[in-house]
Structures are given as structure tokens and as C-alpha cells.
Swiss-Prot record:
This is Alpha-toxin CsE5. Residues 2-61 form the LCN-type CS-alpha/beta domain. Disulfide bonds join 12-60, 16-36, 22-43, 26-45. Expressed by the venom gland. GO terms for molecular function: sodium channel inhibitor activity; toxin activity. GO terms for cellular component: extracellular region. InterPro entries: LCN-type_CS_alpha_beta_dom (IPR044062), Scorpion_toxin-like (IPR003614), Scorpion_toxin-like_sf (IPR036574), Scorpion_toxinL (IPR018218), Scorpion_toxinL/defensin (IPR002061). SUPFAM superfamilies: Scorpion toxin-like. Pfam families: Toxin_3. It is found in: Secreted. Keywords: Disulfide bond, Ion channel impairing toxin, Neurotoxin, Secreted, Toxin, Voltage-gated sodium channel impairing toxin. Belongs to the long (4 C-C) scorpion toxin superfamily. Sodium channel inhibitor family. Alpha subfamily. Alpha toxins bind voltage-independently at site-3 of sodium channels (Nav) and inhibit the inactivation of the activated channels, thereby blocking neuronal transmission.
Length: 63
């Protein structure tokens, strides 16, 4: 398992305002839990499966 910022198919993080939104998003991706990291206004997940995509150094390419 790993921790990190979940990303969509374009390697873009999920913006957020509420922890509930991120927790649900992370649970859908089979993580243990998640929250909205205010410093980056992005969802952060704990305990994601190793094969779940997370933010890397690549650029965000919105669909």
C-alpha cells in the first residue's frame, strides 16, 4: 500500500474543499482513508493499493 495524491487519467490531482469528498474519493479507490489537504487544496489518500495512480512529477493534462 502507499499514500499519495490520487489523480485522474490526465495525471491531475482532485481539488477539494471538504474532507468528506476526499474520503469518499479515496475509499472508492480502495484506500484506507483520505482528507482534503488545505495547503495544496487537493485530496490526499492513505493506504492506496500500489497499482492506484498517484501524482508524480509529470504535468497535469486536463481531458
Amino acid at each position: 500500500k502507499k499514500d499519495g495524491y490520487p489523480v485522474d487519467s490526465g495525471n491531475c490531482k482532485y481539488e477539494c474543499l471538504k474532507d468528506d469528498y476526499c474520503n469518499d474519493l479515496c475509499l472508492e479507490r480502495k484506500a484506507d482513508k483520505g482528507y482534503c489537504y488545505w495547503g495544496k487544496v487537493s485530496c490526499y489518500c492513505y493506504g492506496l493499493p500500489d497499482n492506484s495512480p498517484t501524482k508524480t512529477s509529470g504535468k497535469c493534462n486536463p481531458a
